[in-house]
Each structure stands twice: as C-alpha cells, then as structure tokens.
Amino acid sequence: VLSRRQRQMCIRDRIKSNYQNFMIQKATELGVTKFLPIIFDRTVVRKINKERLEKIVIEASEQSNRMNVPSIENPQTLDGFLKKNSIDLIFTDINSNTIKVDKLKLTDKPVCIIIGPEGDFSEHERDKILSFKGVQSVKINENILRSETAVISAISIVNYVIN
C-alpha cells in the first residue's frame, strides 16, 4: 500500500466484463481499499458479479503483496452514496469546470474518485455531484478516456498527491 490513508473508489455498475476485471485488478494493485459501485441514470446492467470481483481483488492483492484485500460493496444509488459518506470527493468530469491536478487539496477524510458511466453523467447527476460539500472536479486528461484508463490515471494522481 502506498499510503496509510484510506482510499476509496466509486465505479459505475457495469462495463464489459473483461474491462471491468482489468480495472478492478489494476485499482487493487494501486492501493484502492474499497469499491463502491454506483447506479447512474444511464446504467444499463444493474447487477455485478460480486463473487467474481472478490476473486479478482484477492488475486491482485496477493500479486502486489498487499496485506489487506479491498472490499466490494453492494451497488447503491448516487443519492444514497452522497447522503451517507463524509469524504473528499474527486469528480473526473471533462465537461465541468475543473481544477488543475497541482491544486488538488485533500483532507484526512477518505478519498473517493467518481468515474462516470459510458454514456456520461446526466445533467442532474452532474449538478448533484458538483453540489456535494468537499467535491473537487479534476480533468485528468485533455482527451476522453476509456473507463479503465481513467481509473488508473485518477488513482495514480491521487497517490501522487497523497504521497
């Protein structure tokens, strides 16, 4: 683990299985402690194969010599997630006003990175996320990235800022 600070990550409910497996594996290797699947407005498949994902995080934890295995939470709505979490929220949205990575400010709260759904966030979701206390909207690249690339990039940026 790169830091003792607890890190979390939000992922959308479902992407193609092999891409999701890769994303979960790499995020585990990079130190994510918890996966929080969110059901967005444009989520098509609302179920995850939790057993399969748990197997992936165990294998990735062993491969990277992690002492702890990340947990995989049950899918939840965006509203439910925002209401019950006290976090530093990093919103990776190419369409909103963003800060530069070097301006990212993190507190002692857990960090949660929101990576959007394939069809992008709805305006309603974007507004809801941007109104969350403690949210920081960060552009991680000039180009629109595939989800698995965005996850690796965003986690690497957070690891850099934390350490």
Regions found by a protein language model. Name each.
Residues 27, 57, 141:
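Residue-level signal for inorganic ion chemistry
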Residues 1-11:
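Single conserved hydrophobic/aromatic residue that forms the stacking wall/gate
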Residues 46-117:
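S-adenosyl-L-methionine/SAH cofactor-binding core of RNA-modifying enzymes
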Residues 28-31, 130-131:
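Non-catalytic positions within long, well-ordered alpha-helices that form the structural scaffold/packing
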Residues 123-163:
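Structured adenosyl-cofactor binding patch, chiefly the S-adenosyl-L-methionine
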Residues 12-21:
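Short, glycine-rich nucleotide/cofactor-binding loops
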Residues 40-43, 142:
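Short, ordered loop/turn segments at secondary-structure junctions
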